[in-house]
Amino acid sequence: MTVMIVSEVAGQSAQGYDGMLAIVGDALRQAPGFIMHASHRVDAGWRIVELWASREDATQFFANHVAPHLPDGIRPKLSFQPLHSLVKP
């Protein structure tokens, strides 16, 4: 089932986010189950929204590619929401 993952990253800056995306971006684009990624600044830091084919695909990618590169003090708060619908072009 397609899931939406929202990552709230307190204390993250645009520079920190851009650096992380530079590290994991190619792997993300090729990851099994990956559908889309978007991000924006919030008052407390940064928010990332992703769509994945399954929660398992998302958590495996996070564990293998994101978590090993997180700087000290940066720990995203993840929430998962199964989607009722997804409309693609």
Walk through the language-model features, giving the residues of each.
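Short S/T/G/P-rich N-terminal loop/turn motif that feeds into the first structured element of a domain
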Residues: 1-49, 53-67, 74-89
